[in-house]
Amino acid sequence: MSLFTLFTLAIGLAMDTFAVSVCKGLAMKKMSLKKAFINGAYFGLFQAGMPIIGYFLGISFRNYITKIDHWISFVLLVFLGIKMLKEAFDNEACSTNDSVAFRVMIVLAVATSIDALAVGITFAFLKVNLLLAVSLIGIITFLLSMLGVRLGHVFGARYKRVAECVGGIVLIVLGFKILLEHLGILAQLF
Protein backbone atom coordinates (compact mmCIF):
# COMPACT_ATOMS: atom_id res chain seq x y z
CA MET A 1 0.00 0.00 0.00
CA SER A 2 1.47 3.34 -1.02
CA LEU A 3 2.24 6.20 1.34
CA PHE A 4 -0.55 8.27 -0.22
CA THR A 5 -3.08 5.49 0.29
CA LEU A 6 -1.95 4.98 3.90
CA PHE A 7 -2.19 8.71 4.54
CA THR A 8 -5.69 8.83 3.05
CA LEU A 9 -6.74 5.79 5.09
CA ALA A 10 -5.37 7.38 8.27
CA ILE A 11 -7.42 10.52 7.65
CA GLY A 12 -10.54 8.45 6.98
CA LEU A 13 -10.08 6.47 10.19
CA ALA A 14 -9.46 9.64 12.21
CA MET A 15 -12.77 11.24 11.24
CA ASP A 16 -14.76 9.41 13.93
CA THR A 17 -12.39 10.62 16.62
CA PHE A 18 -12.39 14.09 15.09
CA ALA A 19 -16.20 14.20 15.34
CA VAL A 20 -16.14 13.06 18.98
CA SER A 21 -13.39 15.58 19.71
CA VAL A 22 -15.50 18.38 18.22
CA CYS A 23 -18.20 17.41 20.73
CA LYS A 24 -15.64 17.41 23.54
CA GLY A 25 -14.54 20.91 22.55
CA LEU A 26 -18.14 22.06 22.35
CA ALA A 27 -18.68 20.90 25.95
CA MET A 28 -15.66 22.85 27.26
CA LYS A 29 -16.49 26.09 29.00
CA LYS A 30 -12.83 27.08 28.78
CA MET A 31 -10.43 25.72 26.18
CA SER A 32 -7.79 23.53 27.81
CA LEU A 33 -4.68 22.51 25.87
CA LYS A 34 -4.04 19.80 28.47
CA LYS A 35 -7.49 18.26 27.91
CA ALA A 36 -7.06 18.51 24.12
CA PHE A 37 -3.68 16.74 24.42
CA ILE A 38 -5.08 13.96 26.64
CA ASN A 39 -8.02 13.55 24.26
CA GLY A 40 -5.66 13.28 21.28
CA ALA A 41 -3.35 10.87 23.10
CA TYR A 42 -6.14 8.43 23.98
CA PHE A 43 -7.58 8.45 20.48
CA GLY A 44 -4.17 8.34 18.76
CA LEU A 45 -2.92 5.42 20.85
CA PHE A 46 -6.07 3.36 20.39
CA GLN A 47 -6.35 4.11 16.68
CA ALA A 48 -2.71 3.00 16.28
CA GLY A 49 -3.02 -0.04 18.54
CA MET A 50 -6.18 -1.57 17.14
CA PRO A 51 -4.80 -2.18 13.61
CA ILE A 52 -1.91 -4.09 15.19
CA ILE A 53 -4.37 -6.37 16.99
CA GLY A 54 -6.42 -6.70 13.80
CA TYR A 55 -3.32 -7.49 11.75
CA PHE A 56 -2.35 -10.39 14.00
CA LEU A 57 -5.93 -11.66 14.02
CA GLY A 58 -5.91 -11.54 10.22
CA ILE A 59 -2.52 -13.28 10.02
CA SER A 60 -3.86 -16.12 12.16
CA PHE A 61 -6.45 -17.09 9.55
CA ARG A 62 -4.89 -15.65 6.38
CA ASN A 63 -3.90 -19.07 4.99
CA TYR A 64 -7.52 -20.20 5.03
CA ILE A 65 -8.96 -17.29 3.07
CA THR A 66 -6.25 -16.08 0.67
CA LYS A 67 -8.51 -16.60 -2.35
CA ILE A 68 -11.07 -14.10 -1.04
CA ASP A 69 -8.86 -11.76 1.00
CA HIS A 70 -9.42 -8.74 -1.25
CA TRP A 71 -13.17 -9.30 -1.11
CA ILE A 72 -12.95 -9.31 2.70
CA SER A 73 -10.98 -6.05 2.63
CA PHE A 74 -13.52 -4.56 0.23
CA VAL A 75 -16.55 -5.61 2.30
CA LEU A 76 -15.05 -4.42 5.61
CA LEU A 77 -14.00 -1.01 4.27
CA VAL A 78 -17.27 -0.38 2.41
CA PHE A 79 -19.31 -1.53 5.42
CA LEU A 80 -17.36 0.79 7.74
CA GLY A 81 -17.72 3.67 5.27
CA ILE A 82 -21.48 3.19 4.95
CA LYS A 83 -21.78 2.94 8.74
CA MET A 84 -19.88 6.21 9.12
CA LEU A 85 -22.08 7.93 6.51
CA LYS A 86 -25.21 6.66 8.27
CA GLU A 87 -23.92 7.99 11.60
CA ALA A 88 -23.28 11.37 9.98
CA PHE A 89 -26.95 11.71 9.12
CA ASP A 90 -28.36 10.42 12.40
CA ASN A 91 -29.79 13.41 14.19
CA GLU A 92 -27.82 12.69 17.32
CA ALA A 93 -26.50 15.84 18.89
CA CYS A 94 -23.15 15.97 20.60
CA SER A 95 -23.79 14.07 23.79
CA THR A 96 -20.54 14.15 25.69
CA ASN A 97 -18.91 16.20 28.38
CA ASP A 98 -15.47 17.73 28.65
CA SER A 99 -14.12 15.07 31.02
CA VAL A 100 -10.87 13.34 30.09
CA ALA A 101 -11.07 10.92 33.02
CA PHE A 102 -9.85 7.39 32.32
CA ARG A 103 -13.32 5.80 32.51
CA VAL A 104 -14.77 8.31 30.05
CA MET A 105 -11.90 8.30 27.57
CA ILE A 106 -11.33 4.55 27.50
CA VAL A 107 -14.93 3.95 26.44
CA LEU A 108 -14.75 6.62 23.73
CA ALA A 109 -11.33 5.45 22.51
CA VAL A 110 -12.43 1.82 22.20
CA ALA A 111 -15.74 2.73 20.56
CA THR A 112 -14.11 4.94 17.94
CA SER A 113 -11.28 2.50 17.17
CA ILE A 114 -13.28 -0.64 16.34
CA ASP A 115 -13.12 0.32 12.66
CA ALA A 116 -9.32 0.53 12.98
CA LEU A 117 -9.35 -3.07 14.26
CA ALA A 118 -11.25 -4.14 11.13
CA VAL A 119 -8.82 -2.22 8.92
CA GLY A 120 -5.96 -4.00 10.69
CA ILE A 121 -7.47 -7.32 9.64
CA THR A 122 -7.36 -6.14 6.02
CA PHE A 123 -3.67 -5.23 6.46
CA ALA A 124 -2.92 -8.94 6.91
CA PHE A 125 -4.03 -9.55 3.32
CA LEU A 126 -2.35 -6.57 1.69
CA LYS A 127 1.23 -5.45 1.21
CA VAL A 128 1.39 -2.96 4.05
CA ASN A 129 4.31 -1.63 6.06
CA LEU A 130 2.58 -2.12 9.42
CA LEU A 131 4.91 0.15 11.40
CA LEU A 132 4.45 3.00 8.92
CA ALA A 133 0.69 2.44 8.75
CA VAL A 134 0.08 2.46 12.50
CA SER A 135 2.46 5.39 12.99
CA LEU A 136 0.56 7.46 10.42
CA ILE A 137 -2.81 6.42 11.83
CA GLY A 138 -1.75 7.29 15.40
CA ILE A 139 -0.12 10.62 14.59
CA ILE A 140 -2.88 11.83 12.27
CA THR A 141 -5.57 10.76 14.74
CA PHE A 142 -3.75 12.52 17.57
CA LEU A 143 -3.42 15.77 15.60
CA LEU A 144 -6.97 15.74 14.20
CA SER A 145 -8.40 14.95 17.63
CA MET A 146 -6.60 17.91 19.16
CA LEU A 147 -7.78 20.09 16.27
CA GLY A 148 -11.32 18.78 16.73
CA VAL A 149 -11.36 19.86 20.38
CA ARG A 150 -10.22 23.34 19.36
CA LEU A 151 -12.68 23.66 16.47
CA GLY A 152 -15.53 22.33 18.60
CA HIS A 153 -14.77 24.88 21.27
CA VAL A 154 -14.54 27.77 18.81
CA PHE A 155 -17.15 26.92 16.17
CA GLY A 156 -19.48 24.35 17.70
CA ALA A 157 -20.69 21.10 16.16
CA ARG A 158 -21.03 22.17 12.53
CA TYR A 159 -17.95 20.15 11.40
CA LYS A 160 -19.05 16.86 12.98
CA ARG A 161 -21.28 15.77 10.09
CA VAL A 162 -18.79 16.84 7.41
CA ALA A 163 -15.98 14.92 9.14
CA GLU A 164 -18.03 11.73 9.35
CA CYS A 165 -19.11 12.04 5.69
CA VAL A 166 -15.52 12.55 4.51
CA GLY A 167 -14.34 9.60 6.58
CA GLY A 168 -17.08 7.34 5.24
CA ILE A 169 -16.46 8.29 1.63
CA VAL A 170 -12.70 7.75 2.01
CA LEU A 171 -13.20 4.24 3.42
CA ILE A 172 -15.66 3.30 0.65
CA VAL A 173 -13.34 4.60 -2.09
CA LEU A 174 -10.38 2.69 -0.61
CA GLY A 175 -12.48 -0.48 -0.46
CA PHE A 176 -13.35 -0.16 -4.15
CA LYS A 177 -9.74 0.68 -5.01
CA ILE A 178 -8.48 -2.51 -3.35
CA LEU A 179 -11.10 -4.64 -5.10
CA LEU A 180 -10.61 -3.09 -8.55
CA GLU A 181 -6.82 -3.47 -8.30
CA HIS A 182 -7.23 -7.12 -7.33
CA LEU A 183 -9.54 -7.75 -10.28
CA GLY A 184 -7.05 -6.07 -12.62
CA ILE A 185 -9.53 -3.37 -13.62
CA LEU A 186 -7.54 -0.61 -12.00
CA ALA A 187 -3.77 -0.39 -12.16
CA GLN A 188 -2.17 0.57 -8.90
CA LEU A 189 -2.49 4.34 -9.03
CA PHE A 190 -1.31 5.29 -5.59
UniProtKB/Swiss-Prot annotation:
It is found in: Cell membrane. Its main location: membrane. It holds the Pfam family Mntp. This is Putative manganese efflux pump MntP. One of its GO terms (molecular function) is manganese ion transmembrane transporter activity. The chain crosses the membrane at residues 3-23, 41-61, 65-85, 106-126, 128-148, 166-186. Keywords: Cell membrane, Ion transport, Manganese, Membrane, Transmembrane, Transmembrane helix, Transport. GO terms for cellular component: plasma membrane. InterPro entries: Mntp/YtaF, Put_MntP. It is a multi-pass membrane protein. It comes from Lachnoclostridium phytofermentans (strain ATCC 700394 / DSM 18823 / ISDg). The keyword NADP does not apply.
